[in-house]
């Protein structure tokens, strides 16, 4: 498992009406490789509103259609739920993800 990888998660939450949802791993690699049982992820929705806290992803990343990563809705998921690999972000998309996460968390460079 690596930062920037996308996974389809079955029944991610009782509040989520979808049977499955794609998430991108945003935790730092040291945490991913540690004994911690969870990682921080951002959900992928088909909606993309152009907010500074969202980045566009699409079929090149393994998705069925154009979508958006929503960095305002970070969640902690057990690593054991992240088994259905979909694809991964390009280096350019990872840079955009970093910017969107900084905006969502109001971090300054």
Regions found by a protein language model. Name each.
Residues 1-109:
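Conserved functional hotspots at enzyme active or ligand-binding sites that engage polyanionic ligands
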């Amino acid at each position: 498992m690596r930062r920037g990888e996308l996974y389809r998660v079955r029944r991610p939450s009782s509040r989520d009406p979808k049977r499955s949802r794609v998430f991108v791993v945003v935790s730092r690699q040291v945490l991913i490789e540690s004994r911690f049982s969870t990682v921080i992820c951002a959900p992928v929705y088909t909606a993309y509103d152009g907010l500074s806290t969202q980045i566009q992803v699409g079929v090149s990343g393994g998705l069925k259609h154009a979508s958006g990563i929503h960095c305002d809705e970070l969640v902690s998921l057990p690593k054991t739920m992240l088994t259905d690999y979909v694809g991964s972000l390009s280096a350019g998309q990872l840079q955009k993800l970093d910017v969107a996460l900084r905006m969502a968390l109001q971090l300054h460079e």
